[in-house]
Swiss-Prot record:
Gene: dapF
Active site: 87, 229
Pathway assigned in UniProt: Amino-acid biosynthesis; L-lysine biosynthesis via DAP pathway; DL-2,6-diaminopimelate from LL-2,6-diaminopimelate: step 1/1
Family named by the database record: Belongs to the diaminopimelate epimerase family.
BP terms from Gene Ontology: lysine biosynthetic process via diaminopimelate
Catalytic activity, as annotated: (2S,6S)-2,6-diaminopimelate = meso-2,6-diaminopimelate
Keywords: Amino-acid biosynthesis, Cytoplasm, Isomerase, Lysine biosynthesis
UniProt cross-references to HAMAP family, sorted A to Z: DAP_epimerase
Species: Mycobacterium sp. (strain KMS)
Name under which the protein is recorded: Diaminopimelate epimerase
Length: 293
């Protein structure tokens, strides 16, 4: 069974090419695969398939709204094995992998997800240097879910609930310094209102917008702290702009894994950043079977 390993600003993934969607991605095998001691280690798993194959295999009962049967489909699983609607960094790595593996010849195409279609653009992709790419993903229009609060690292933050295809609570703290953000225990479990977010929520803590940029850390549901979160950076950008009384704009979001650029318009949003493919290899069939239970 072939695999690839890649990351987008150190948000890392195991990619499983499965064009017929035949693999049984049980929570047990996904969590084992993502375990950094007993598996390959990753923040999540990306099954590389098509929407038609996923539908035929019963991955979903009907095509997600706006996704065509002929579209590529990113079947994304969190590190705990749960299914996620969307992953911005994952889409960038997914699109990069398709080009690098010669599964796709275009630099502009659509990747389907549970959250709907995500148009992608690879900028100046060079087949002679396949391991690196710069990718923009159109993330769609965000929806505001109202204000809320969460306790992160023993400190309560107030934030803005934002739907980016998955739920976020982006907390801008105008008094937070870079040093305080770096010292915050984001890895510890976060406390939030389950009535507001019954399916869980990704929580971002960020500094105020200064010189066209913010700094952010994130606790992802089903994963814990990650070095980056693509949908989280979009949510952070929306919250930072709202803090300034703006609804549209472009800014850089600094995360522990690097820097991405987010643009928010009246009708949609865009995420641009790097992708890197680290390795390809073969999973032992015996290992896979032993972790299906």
């Amino acid at each position: 069974m072939q695999f690839a390993k890649g990351h987008g600003t150190q948000n890392d993934f195991v990619l499983l090419p499965d064009l017929d969607a035949r693999l049984a991605l049980t929570p047990a095998v996904v969590s084992a695969l993502c375990d950094r001691r007993r598996g390959l280690g990753a923040d999540g798993v990306l099954r590389v398939t098509t929407a038609k194959a996923a539908l035929s295999a019963g991955v979903f009962e009907r095509l997600p709204e706006g996704v065509g049967a002929g579209d590529w489909y990113m079947d994304y699983r969190n590190a705990d094995g749960s299914i996620a609607q969307m992953c911005g960094n994952g889409v960038r790595v997914f699109a990069h992998y398709l080009r690098a593996a010669d599964l796709e010849s275009r630099d502009e195409f659509v990747v389907g997800s549970l959250a709907g279609p995500r148009p992608v653009v690879l900028h100046g992709f060079d087949l002679a240097h396949r391991s690196r790419a710069e990718v923009t993903v159109e993330m769609g229009k965000v929806n505001l879910l109202g204000s809320g609060s969460a306790v992160v690292g023993g400190r309560r933050f107030t934030g803005l609930g934002i739907d980016v295809g998955n739920p976020h609570l982006a907390c801008v703290d105008t008094t937070l310094t870079e040093a305080e953000l770096a010292a915050l225990d984001v890895a510890a479990p976060v406390d939030f209102d389950p009535a507001q977010f019954p399916d869980g929520v990704n929580v971002e803590v960020l500094t105020a917008l200064r010189d066209g940029a913010v700094s952010m850390r994130v606790h992802e549901r089903g994963v814990g702290e990650t070095r980056s979160c693509g949908t989280g950076t979009v949510a952070a950008a929306v919250a930072a702009l709202a803090q300034e009384g703006a609804a549209v704009g472009t800014l850089d979001v600094r995360i522990p894994g690097g820097v991405v650029t987010v643009s928010v318009t009246d009708t949609t949003s865009f995420l641009r950043g790097p992708s890197e493919l680290v390795a390809t290899g073969e999973l032992a069939g015996e290992w896979w079977q032993s972790h299906q239970r």
